[in-house]
Design a protein with these regions (language model features):
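Conserved acetyl-CoA binding element of GNAT-fold acetyltransferases
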Residues: 118-130, 184
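Conserved active-site alpha-helix within GNAT-family acetyltransferase domains
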Residues: 139, 165-183
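Conserved acetyl-CoA pyrophosphate-binding loop and the N-cap/start of the following alpha-helix
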Residues: 132, 136-144
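Conserved GNAT-fold acetyl-CoA-binding loop/helix
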Residues: 9-11, 15, 26-60
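A short helix-loop-beta-strand connector motif used in the catalytic cores of GNAT acetyltransferases and
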Residues: 52-74, 78
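Active-site acidic-Proline motif in GNAT/NAT acetyltransferases
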Residues: 129-131, 135, 165-166
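Conserved GNAT acetyl-CoA-binding A-motif
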Residues: 121, 151-162
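Conserved beta-strand in the GNAT
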Residues: 72-74, 100-111, 122, 127
Length: 190
């Protein structure tokens, strides 16, 4: 658990975070669709965000967090002024109505048992509410992921991730951390 300069605590995911976590996950998915691929890609990402997908995804997140504590971390902002501070509150609301804690981001490294997928640690997702970008919170999330990855028993001492080449902001962030192009991920429809 760490405290960022902006008063945002980075801590392990807890089951009570599920509703707020899901709203951030939606932001992640819709941002991929909207920001990196046009209307067709956005439509595909919107269409997959069904209630069934939500339940399956959150069940998987909880299993991963239980099996490998610390592989899923959240950034939680607390506002004591009663004015809210953006982000997503624990019931999935917009977080602007009171001074309670709000989830403003998350990072998800795959559990150690899944590291054989790439023979390395895998950063599955890192997402931050737009209001908190550029504040240092993403750096705290990345630090937590890297610390966790270093604790895993890995075939190769490396961490990999998938980032869309059109996502300039994310690519610049990962470049700052020394991520280099390593192979090429290709895909096709089933």
């Amino acid at each position: 658990m760490s405290e960022t300069p902006d008063g945002v605590e980075v801590r392990p995911f807890e089951p009570g975070d599920a509703a707020a976590f899901w709203e951030l996950k939606r932001g992640f998915e819709l941002g991929i669709g909207e920001g990196t691929g046009g209307d067709d890609k956005l439509s595909k990402y919107e269409a997959k965000l069904t209630d069934d997908y939500r339940e399956r995804y959150l069940s998987w997140v909880e299993r991963c967090a239980t099996d490998d504590p610390g592989c899923v971390v959240v950034a939680e902002a607390v506002s004591g002024d009663g004015h809210g501070d953006g982000g997503i509150d624990s019931d999935g609301g917009d977080g602007d109505d009171d001074g309670d804690a709000r989830l403003v981001g998350y990072a998800f490294a795959l559990p150690e048992e899944m590291t054989f997928i790439w023979d390395a640690a895998v950063l599955n997702e890192l997402f931050l509410d737009a209001d908190y970008r550029g504040t240092g919170v993403a750096d705290e999330l990345m630090a937590a992921v890297l610390d966790h990855a270093r604790s895993q028993d890995l075939p190769l001492d490396r961490i990999v991730l998938d980032v869309d080449e059109a996502n300039d902001r994310a690519r610049a962030f990962y470049d700052r951390y020394g991520f280099d192009h390593w192979g090429e991920l290709v895909a096709r429809d089933l």
